[in-house]
């Protein structure tokens, strides 16, 4: 018979991607026969020794052809430098075809201690790029899914020092799959909309990484609030 109030041991441990998991294992081994729950209090998780995700900002501008596809793009982003290439991930070699692409990153110094917090540097950079691609598709009057697909399909296979995109077929497969899963193109009720995005966690030194595509179906309610109805995700 288990007496739950006496049998469950709840040590308060730091929780960052399982980095303190070995402590939980040690506690569990010392408390054999009892389930061990590991968690961190808010004060411990965000205590005086914590590091924060850095603030970041980016600017984008592009020149487009007669069909609305980019022929040149210039991207600048800035943020506190940490953990090597974190701040430039996702922007050094986007999957989209652009005959002319210029990227600059500006490091800043801050008194706030910074580091990854629940995600990597590619998170804001993905938001920047995908938001801008949406703006370009809207300006061109094109479907954002098909606009992305065309730009990825046009991009040649990646070559060192030349550009292009590695695993192009996988990018297209993930994009097509999430569009199919979400019934992309199917009419929605009034006030509803779908959004689509695709990225990976590439680093300059690691060109192959998991590709993730996502479609979110939302509704703007009568009182102006945003309601999420569905999220479809495809990984390749």
Where does each model-flagged region fall?
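Small-residue-enriched transmembrane helix starts and helix-helix packing motifs
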Residues: 2-30
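Alpha-helical support elements that line or immediately flank enzyme active sites
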Residues: 28-31, 79-80, 85-89, 117-152, ...
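Phosphate/diphosphate-binding loops
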Residues: 33-82, 188, 194-195, 202, ...
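Amphipathic alpha-helical
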Residues: 35, 158-193
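Structured core elements
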Residues: 37, 59-63, 70-74, 97, ...
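Glycine-rich loop/linker segments at domain edges
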Residues: 54-132, 234-235
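Generic recognition of flexible, low-complexity loop/linker segments
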Residues: 59-61, 134, 183-186, 202-207, ...
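Conserved helix-loop functional segments at active or binding sites
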Residues: 104-107, 138, 180, 184
């Amino acid at each position: 018979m288990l007496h739950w109030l006496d049998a469950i041991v709840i040590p308060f441990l730091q929780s960052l991607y399982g980095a303190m998991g070995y402590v939980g294992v040690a506690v569990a081994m010392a408390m054999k026969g009892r389930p061990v729950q590991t968690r961190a209090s808010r004060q411990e998780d965000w205590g005086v020794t914590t590091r924060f995700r850095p603030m970041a900002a980016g600017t984008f501008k592009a020149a487009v052809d007669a069909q609305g596809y980019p022929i040149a793009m210039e991207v600048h982003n800035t943020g506190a430098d940490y953990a090597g290439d974190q701040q430039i991930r996702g922007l050094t070699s986007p999957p989209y075809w652009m005959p002319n692409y210029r990227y600059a990153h500006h490091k800043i110094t801050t008194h706030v201690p910074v580091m990854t917090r629940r995600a990597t540097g590619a998170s804001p950079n993905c938001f920047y790029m995908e938001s801008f691609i949406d703006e370009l598709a809207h300006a061109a009057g094109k479907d954002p899914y098909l606009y992305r697909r065309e730009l990825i399909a046009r991009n040649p296979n990646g070559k060192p020092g030349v550009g292009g995109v590695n695993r192009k077929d996988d990018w297209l497969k993930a994009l097509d799959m999430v569009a199919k899963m979400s019934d992309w193109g199917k009419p929605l009720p009034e006030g509803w909309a779908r959004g689509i995005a695709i990225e990976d966690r590439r680093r300059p030194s690691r060109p192959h990484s998991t590709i993730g595509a996502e479609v979110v179906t939302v509704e703007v309610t009568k009182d102006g609030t945003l309601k999420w109805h569905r999220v479809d995700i495809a990984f390749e």
